[in-house]
Amino acid sequence: MKQTVYIASPESQQIHVWNLNHEGALTLTQVVDVPGQVQPMVVSPDKRYLYVGVRPEFRVLAYRIAPDDGALTFAAESALPGSPTHISTDHQGQFVFVGSYNAGNVSVTRLEDGLPVGVVDVVEGLDGCHSANISPDNRTLWVPALKQDRICLFTVSEDGHLVAQDPAEVTTVEGAGPRHMVFHPNEQYAYCVNELNSSVDVWELKDPHGNIECVQTLDMMPENFSDTRWAADIHITPDGRHLYACDRTASLITVFSVSEDGSVLSKEGFQPTETQPRGFNVDHSGKYLIAAGQKSHHISVYEIVGEQGLLHEKGRYAVGQGPMWVVVNAH
């Protein structure tokens, strides 16, 4: 398995393309100059395209991915109704979902043969919309509205329209600020990192009565932490055994172990990392974690070690200015 790591740096308007080898070392293979401040990125389900959101002219760009080395070639673009904060796709590669924090909306862009061809739906009134996350069964779009302490739930119709479910939302504790999400591989649980109180919620997707319930909330910060809480990103290993979340003020990554059924998180430790870690990701083997420092302009690679999933630094690399997003593609 070959793996390519993409790093988006909006301040220098670049995507750095790296080869990740089996020992966790990175080799720079390409630097792409992007026509705008590039922020969120996602790889298409068939691994043929990288979709990126740019501003100040709000667009989604599609780059064709070379199957041999992961190199990028521009392929298409489509306008967006707000500044892109987060970008994702459905599992069949029919639609791109874009959450916009500033615009307070989530939009759906239709794909034709992998290329974006236009917005088919926009839902407004999502104050502080920070991500759009499709459930493993491709049926429910989870959309955190950070400033409203709620996660809105939509069914995606065949033509890409978003239909509010019943119930239409779940709520967090006041002042939590739900931000980004991941799902357990067993498709029974979701995990949401809350920006404003630096906590992680565990959501049971369906209990025996068909309800969605928060079954655990864990503080992700050290006990003696007294500064402003400012959590950012969350990821889980492919085997579902380890979960990680980062805080930008403390510049640390919190390490969690996950119970076998996915219902319980246990805090295992903390890893100091790059300054102001806005984004990170886990590779497809589950052996390595790559974190980007928005203020350090570097990335660090960590090996995931042992039953606790603790992080051991393997290497550090300079990238563009203000790196914010990390994506790993296996090919």
Swiss-Prot record:
Keywords: Acetylation, Carbohydrate metabolism, Glucose metabolism, Hydrolase. Signal peptide: none annotated. PANTHER family: 6-PHOSPHOGLUCONOLACTONASE, 6-PHOSPHOGLUCONOLACTONASE-RELATED. Belongs to the cycloisomerase 2 family. SUPFAM superfamilies: Nitrous oxide reductase, N-terminal domain. One of its GO terms (biological process) is glucose metabolic process. GO terms for cellular component: cytosol. The modification N6-acetyllysine is found at residue 287. Gene3D superfamilies: YVTN repeat-like/Quinoprotein amine dehydrogenase. This is 6-phosphogluconolactonase.
